[in-house]
């Protein structure tokens, strides 16, 4: 990340020495037990999607906390791992909205400019949200602020109350915010199903003269 466009702009948004603080945190937690995702994938979202290419942001809360699930991309798991319930519902809504995506690895979305960003970037095995409030929120809020400053239109997809709070960071009138209930089985029937975020995103991108996302790739 040090040599990417992300690095300098994120650094501007953070207190002096924050990157060193993150590295110290990573050294400590990865030495202390099993942490997901693998350390080399912690920054996968901004390593896979260049700032210049970002057209869509899908914000998650924290990584999956089961073995081999987390890839450093929000909601995504490798194809040899069963899709967790929220991802199953995302793919169900996609099927109803546009068509069937056979893979539940979302890397192809990230490669097309969909920033799959979790608010927290690490989690201990079996302990959802255990790293919440420790270090990541300032860093990932900085990423959202950097994307907000893009002159090109971006779609921010905010699912659930946690993600929707991030609207406060999105002030650029060029951008579109699509929000609904979370795809979790606990809330998907309260407005996530039927919200058509994928076709709405593409309609907006096309209207702005941008390439739509191939959500089925």
Swiss-Prot record:
| Keywords, alphabetical | Cytoplasm, DNA damage, DNA repair, Hydrolase
Which residues of this protein are catalytic? 62 (proton acceptor)
| GO CC annotation terms, alphabetical | cytoplasm
Which GO terms fall under molecular function for this chain's record? uracil DNA N-glycosylase activity
Instruction: Name the Pfam families on file.
Output: UDG
Q: List the disulfide bonds.
A: none
Which InterPro entries does the protein's record reference?
Answer: UDG_fam1, Ura-DNA_Glyclase_AS, Uracil-DNA_glycosylase-like, Uracil-DNA_glycosylase-like_sf
**What's a BP term from Gene Ontology annotated to this protein?**
base-excision repair, AP site formation via deaminated base removal
- Catalyzed reaction equations: Hydrolyzes single-stranded DNA or mismatched double-stranded DNA and polynucleotides, releasing free uracil
Record-listed E.C. numbers: 3.2.2.27
**Cross-referenced SMART domains, in alphabetical order?**
UDG, UreE_C
Its annotated compartments are: Cytoplasm
Which Gene3D superfamilies is this protein grouped with?
Uracil-DNA glycosylase-like domain
Q: What job does the chain carry out?
A: Excises uracil residues from the DNA which can arise as a result of misincorporation of dUMP residues by DNA polymerase or due to deamination of cytosine.
Similarity annotation: Belongs to the uracil-DNA glycosylase (UDG) superfamily. UNG family.
Which NCBIfam families does this one have?
PRK05254.1-1, PRK05254.1-2, PRK05254.1-4, PRK05254.1-5, ung
The record's section on PANTHER family has: URACIL-DNA GLYCOSYLASE
Q: What is this protein called?
A: Uracil-DNA glycosylase
What organism does the UniProt record list as the source? Answer: Streptococcus sanguinis (strain SK36)
């Amino acid at each position: 990340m040090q040599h990417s466009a992300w690095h300098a702009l994120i650094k501007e948004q953070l207190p002096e020495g924050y990157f060193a603080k993150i590295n110290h945190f990573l050294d400590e937690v990865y030495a202390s037990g099993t942490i997901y995702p693998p350390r080399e994938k912690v920054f996968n979202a901004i390593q896979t999607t260049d700032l210049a290419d970002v057209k869509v942001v899908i914000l998650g809360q924290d990584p999956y906390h089961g073995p081999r699930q987390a890839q450093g991309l929000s909601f995504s798991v490798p194809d040899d791992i069963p899709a967790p319930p929220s991802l199953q519902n995302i793919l169900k809504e996609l099927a109803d909205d546009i068509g069937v995506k056979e893979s539940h690895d979302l890397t192809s979305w990230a490669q097309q400019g969909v920033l799959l960003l979790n608010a927290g970037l690490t989690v201990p095995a079996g302990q959802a949200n255990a790293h919440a409030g420790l270090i990541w929120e300032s860093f990932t809020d900085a990423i959202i602020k950097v994307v907000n400053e893009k002159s090109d239109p971006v779609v921010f997809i905010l699912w659930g109350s946690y993600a929707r709070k991030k609207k406060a960071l999105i002030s650029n009138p060029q951008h579109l915010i699509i929000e609904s209930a979370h795809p979790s089985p606990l809330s998907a029937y309260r407005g996530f199903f039927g919200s058509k975020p994928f076709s709405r995103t593409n309609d907006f991108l096309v209207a702005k003269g941008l390439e739509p996302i191939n959500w089925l790739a």
